[in-house]
Regions:
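Divalent metal-cofactor coordination and adjacent catalytic microenvironments
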Residues: 1-151
């Protein structure tokens, strides 16, 4: 299926090309074929749409998670913003995740183990991540309960 903004992607290839033209370390994007760029944007949108976003879909039949009814607090602006349009954070997350998908084998997750011991009490956290950490920063204000990401 071809990329259709608002149906299976939050952005067009042309918008992504413009975004990455101004960014360092985006050679993977500029070197990808138009078909692979479309696939990456469609897949990124699909993955992002699986998140527990705040608010509710504006129309129960809409193909994507946005637009939504509701508000979220954006620390960048220091105030609540409405969800009637796709937030800038989701658009940027779509670009960044698409680049990540082109650059990495997302099936091979990286694991991080963190542990803390105080006397007889020991805590251990194992984090498996397939997404760039930048995504958490971008979209966490829009997630229900502002939880951390997991794919």
């Amino acid at each position: 299926m071809a990329l259709v903004k608002g149906t299976n992607s939050y952005v067009t290839v042309a918008e992504a090309d413009s975004y990455f033209a101004e960014r360092l370390h985006s050679e993977t994007w500029s070197g990808a074929s138009p078909t692979d760029k479309e696939k990456a944007l469609i897949t990124a949108t699909s993955l992002l749409d699986q998140k527990p976003w705040v608010g509710e879909a504006e129309d129960e039949l809409q193909p994507l998670a946005f637009p939504r009814i509701g508000y979220y607090y954006d620390p960048k602006y220091g105030r609540d913003l409405d969800l009637i349009d796709t937030p800038e954070r989701v658009v940027k997350a779509t670009y960044e995740l698409a680049l990540h998908l082109l650059s990495n084998d997302v099936m091979a997750a990286s694991s991080t183990v963190k542990s803390l011991s105080v006397g007889p009490i020991s805590l251990q956290q194992i984090s498996t991540s397939k997404e760039p950490s930048k995504l958490d920063e971008l979209i966490s204000p829009l997630l229900e309960n502002s939880g951390s990401l997991s794919w």
